[in-house]
């Protein structure tokens, strides 16, 4: 059910709360950081390129005078870099919100991360899985932490089936992207099950169709051009409106753990956030347990329990 009149103006004060946002230097991530900072949250801007992070911090301080923020250099395609970036935060921080927002899309040819994982799923899913695992001690210090992972409408595509997760038998750029986004949903469902009975929540969102810097990672190939063209014809939104599902999931007091949140408008392209149907089998405990075990095995990162 959509929340008919909800807008980011309804977000309560977030003073005393800390949020880490990946991919926060532009697009949906930047807009999310901006709104949370306006509500008083302390923001940790996480991104791969130091120069882009510094520019984002400069812009955010100009947009939100008095904003409390820091930058975290983080390459989600490098498991060692994730571990090193997360270690000091896990040791000292109290993290109330973790927003797994960064992503890559439509890599033209099959490539791998520095750890040998297919690049798209390695960044979009395995990188965020490892980051979340490493940050669990910081999340556990919060009285009510939330992990919000940004998926995409592509999670519902048939090509998003998790068979051949690493695209070893057959690689298609948008198929790999759909798999990574389906994995985001399945991961969140399993995390929500593991958080059941605690004060903590895990939610997954999709932003509809938005013109953001993710399109800069889109190839000039036929599928990439087709995706952007179709999105443009379906009222492709801006990062402002596309950030609403993330902001709702991160802040609304009644947001339910395990829910998939997307826009309420036609074809889920834009509009007020609402719970939307999960992709096929995404809530299967068997598939969730399988992906969890595969993620621990392939990343070498054991996922600790998060207690109340």
What are these model-derived regions, one by one?
Residues 1-220, 298-306:
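Rossmann-fold NAD(P)H-dependent dehydrogenase/reductase core
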Residues 1-6, 270-281:
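Short, contiguous pre-domain boundary segments
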Residues 26, 49-50, 113, 235, ...:
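Generic alpha-helix initiation/capping and coil-helix boundary signal
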Residues 45, 74, 234, 280-283:
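Pocket-edge positions in alpha/beta enzyme catalytic cores
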Residues 180, 229-276, 285-289, 293, ...:
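C-terminal helical subdomain
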Residues 224-226:
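Flexible internal linker/loop segments at domain or repeat junctions
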């Amino acid at each position: 059910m959509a929340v008919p009149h909800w807008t980011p103006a309804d977000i309560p004060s977030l003073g005393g709360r800390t949020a880490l946002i990946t991919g926060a230097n532009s697009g949906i991530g930047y807009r999310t950081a901006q709104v949370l900072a306006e509500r008083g949250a302390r923001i940790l801007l996480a991104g791969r390129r130091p120069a882009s992070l510094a520019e984002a911090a400069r812009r955010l301080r100009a947009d939100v005078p008095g904003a409390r923020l820091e930058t975290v250099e983080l390459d989600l395609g490098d498991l060692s870099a994730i571990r090193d970036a997360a270690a000091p935060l896990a040791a000292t921080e109290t993290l109330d919100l973790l927003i797994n927002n960064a992503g890559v899309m439509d890599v033209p040819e099959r490539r791998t991360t520095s750890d040998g994982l297919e690049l798209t799923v390695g960044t979009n899913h395995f990188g965020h899985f490892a980051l979340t695992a490493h940050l669990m001690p910081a999340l556990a210090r919060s009285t009510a932490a939330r992990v919000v992972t940004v998926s995409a409408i592509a999670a519902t595509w048939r090509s998003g089936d998790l068979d051949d997760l690493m695209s070893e038998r057959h690689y298609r750029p948008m198929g790999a992207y759909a798999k990574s986004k389906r994995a985001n949903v399945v991961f969140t469902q399993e995390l929500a099950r593991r958080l059941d009975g605690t004060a903590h929540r895990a939610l997954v969102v999709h932003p509809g169709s938005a013109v953001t810097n993710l399109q800069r990672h889109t190839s000039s190939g036929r599928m990439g051009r087709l995706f952007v063209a179709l999105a443009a014809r379906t009222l492709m939104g801006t990062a402002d409106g596309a950030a609403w599902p993330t902001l709702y999931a991160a802040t609304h007091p009644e947001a339910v753990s395990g829910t998939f949140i997307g826009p309420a408008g036609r074809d889920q392209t834009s509009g007020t956030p609402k719970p939307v149907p999960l992709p096929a089998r995404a809530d299967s405990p068997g598939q969730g347990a399988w992906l969890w075990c595969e993620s621990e095995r392939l990343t070498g990162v054991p996922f600790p329990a998060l207690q109340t």
